[in-house]
Amino acid sequence: MITNSLQKTKVKICGIKDLEIAKICKEEGADYIGFNFVSSSPRKIELSNAQKIVEYYKSEKNSPEIVLLFYQNSFEEIESITSVLDHDLVQWVWDDPLINRKKLLYKRQICSYRVQTQIHDQDLKDIEAEFLILDSYSKGVGGGTGETFNWELISKVKRKFLLAGGLDPSNVVNAIEIVKPFGVDVASGVESSPGIKDPQKVIQFIRNVKSTS
């Protein structure tokens, strides 16, 4: 993907569960944070905790945009959460068998596409989303595996996307230099254990990304 050299690489920190980490994301200049509502994920956030973060962000200037992540959730569950929790975007997974794409058309969307083979823009033409997340594939898991994939498989994609899959503070600069994505997305790569964000890793990841812009 060829990006505008003057454009700053966007940063999304996914799987935020507590206010402390949310504050760090804002202070360090993250562009997006993700609330995970996948029932099987160690990163699933309680609605009450999500509300606290939303209220804090609403009281502050220049807060990150809030993304609500769903995978194998019923539409009723998605609707019940999105109707009571202020947010900016909804993130869904392209091969999620439960997703009703038509019912999401009125929302700002991010689609997570899990890469298995070489893909081109033509392969992605039917995906209606503000931008994509190109992530590693793992059967039955919607993301957050901590596994990278062969970036050559997306070398022909010019559509706007966030690169995900196995990124961490030690490799994100190299990933940006090679892939030149619109932005990067991280979950497990800034954790001390599954679902537990490490403040220093979050800080270092964001600063490393910002250093490339």
From Swiss-Prot:
Q: Which domain of life is it from?
A: Bacteria
| Listed pathway(s) | Amino-acid biosynthesis; L-tryptophan biosynthesis; L-tryptophan from chorismate: step 3/5
Q: What Pfam families does this protein's entry cite?
A: PRAI
Top enzyme class: isomerase
Keywords per UniProt: Amino-acid biosynthesis, Aromatic amino acid biosynthesis, Isomerase, Tryptophan biosynthesis
Q: What processes does the entry annotate via GO biological process terms? A: L-tryptophan biosynthetic process
Q: Which residues form a coiled coil?
A: none
Catalyzed reaction equations:
N-(5-phospho-beta-D-ribosyl)anthranilate = 1-(2-carboxyphenylamino)-1-deoxy-D-ribulose 5-phosphate
| An annotated Gene Ontology molecular function | phosphoribosylanthranilate isomerase activity
Gene3D superfamilies from the UniProt entry: Aldolase class I
Q: Does the keyword Isomerase apply?
A: yes
EC number of the protein: 5.3.1.24
State the InterPro entries in the record. Aldolase_TIM (IPR013785), PRAI_dom (IPR001240), RibuloseP-bd_barrel (IPR011060), TrpF_fam (IPR044643)
HAMAP family reported for this sequence:
PRAI
Family, per the entry?
A: Belongs to the TrpF family.
- The identity of this protein, by name, is N-(5'-phosphoribosyl)anthranilate isomerase
Where does this protein come from, organism-wise? Leptospira interrogans serogroup Icterohaemorrhagiae serovar Lai (strain 56601)
